Amino acid sequence: MHSTRSLPLIRFAAATALTVLSVAASPPPPLGPLPDRVTFASADGQTNLVGYVFKPEGPHATRSPAVVMMHGRAGPYSSLANGRYDATTLSQRHQKWGHLWAQQGYLAILVDGFGPRGFPEGFTHQGYSQRPESVNEVTVRPFDAYGALAYLRTRNDVAPDRIALQGWSNGASATLATMSAATPALKSPTPTTGFRGALAFYPGCGLKGKFKTGLLPYAPVRLFIGTADEEVSPQDCSDLVDMSRAQRADLTLKIYPGATHDFDDPGASRQDIPANAAATRDAIAAAIAFFAAALRS
């Protein structure tokens, strides 16, 4: 039996433990200034999307180049969001890249294509076959990318003909479908009417069987994937790129030995893997150089 004198100590210890658990279960603090939340229409004509705008940091042009960012199957938010889905709970990876582009003088917008459709928490890898058609990365999400493109062109701080695209995992698959010259989301796309170029990080390259004979993008596309990817097939991507390049597609693939899925996630669980850290450094440098060339005036 505890004495009356020891009760305050017990209560203090319990309160401290609860505080520690609460902090541990909360998303990490923001990596920089919070992005602005905006809304805009998907090019599907029926979905009102949410976007998070990272504005250029430091000296920049009156009208800046821009990057549209497409999240993966887990959605744009931290796994620790705990029901709060806003700018304060964006995943570290999306924050990192948003601020990276802002530091390069670009405006970046992260598109939330899942939350407005009722799935803000995203999906697990295991449940791929059960995902609803409303978030199909090949037939639906490209319309979201072009909705973001149209929105950016209404802003007076964006260079309307200097906009690029980046996606991760499921969003990288959506990026590939978006960049196809045969995309249903934009008639007769060109680098002027569409995107100037695109980056696809560890996409699933099966693409619902829609591009079995190759993918012909209307602007340059660069893919990045690791040999130790646990979720998607590097071989599928290699086959897709080989078939596409045989038809003179401007599509290239960088394969990182030993790198996993999500290799660029800044969390310790990924960056403590040496192959991931090396792949991240190389991919960031390649991405910066690629967009510098693609988005120059």
Protein language model annotation of sequence segments:
Residues D250-S297:
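C-terminal catalytic histidine-bearing segment of alpha/beta-hydrolase fold enzymes
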Residues R11-S22:
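Bacterial N-terminal signal peptides
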Residues H2-A13:
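Bacterial N-terminal signal peptides that target proteins for export
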Residues S64-V67, R162, R196, P220:
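Alpha/beta-hydrolase fold active-site loops
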Residues P76, N136-L216:
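Primarily recognizes the serine-hydrolase "nucleophile elbow" in alpha/beta-hydrolase
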Residues P189-I255:
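The feature captures the conserved acid-bearing segment of alpha/beta-hydrolase catalytic domains
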Residues R63-T154, D265-D272, A278:
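Serine-hydrolase catalytic machinery in alpha/beta-hydrolase-like enzymes
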Residues P27-T62:
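N-terminal cap/lid segment of alpha/beta-hydrolase-fold proteins
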